[in-house]
A protein has these predicted regions:
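Short, basic/aromatic recognition patches that contact phosphate-bearing ligands
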Residues: 1-76
Length: 76
């Protein structure tokens, strides 16, 4: 189970890094098509998304922030 979360964190970091700035909706749409989406969820739940952002900071020291007009981005 922990490995699955770790892989999700890496996936989220890679998605945001690849796009520079990306909307919450676009992240959710990409999640719906991801191979890591083992439950076949049609979106990435909001609470899960924010928990992942917090865990990414705690685990890797990578800060993900949101610019309301541009979307999510890696701040450091």
């Amino acid at each position: 189970m922990a490995l699955n979360y770790f892989n999700r964190y890496i996936w989220l970091i890679e998605v945001i890094n690849r796009h520079g700035h990306i909307s919450r909706k676009d992240i959710s749409d990409l999640w719906a098509r991801s191979q890591l989406n083992e439950l076949g969820e049609s979106y990435l739940p909001e609470r899960t998304f924010h928990n992942h952002i917090s865990s990414i900071f705690d685990t890797f020291g990578i800060e993900i922030k949101c610019d309301r007009s541009l979307g999510y981005y890696i701040a450091n």
